[in-house]
Amino acid sequence: LLFGYSVDGGEVAVIDIAQGEGIPTEIIDALTDEQITKWAFNANFERVCLSEYLRRFYPEKFISYSTKEDSVSDYLDPSSWKCSMVWAAYMGLPLSLAGAGAVLGLEEQKLTEGKELIRYFCVPCKATKVNGGRTRNLPQHDMSKWEMFKKYNKRDVE
């Protein structure tokens, strides 16, 4: 739905995939380049999700690290990914981004609305007469929530 990123600590960009925006080619290339280190909180989640996205939309760029003996194959090579959640655990910090940020006293705290926004946009909803029988909430169903979701995504990268 959304892809937020920053290059070398620069300004955070949020790509609105759900509304047709595309990830820049240089970022796609960086995601598949094992010489470029990628950092994320819960990096394995990001790596697996991006593997699926790249296989589906950029199959010519996707490079799997798997071998025939690998039972969980066809994902981006984890060797160029670093996980700040693992680092937090190593230092005895909470394993949530919000918890680690609070303990460290980070200036930019995780937005509290996030869980509700994730439920609204990322979890199927019950079809009702009120919602027109839909089973997914899309950006056009509540643009103000969608804009807040984009801010939430940006803050997570900051």
Q: Language-model segments: which ranges?
A:
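Entry/capping segment at the start of metal-dependent catalytic domains
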Residues: 1
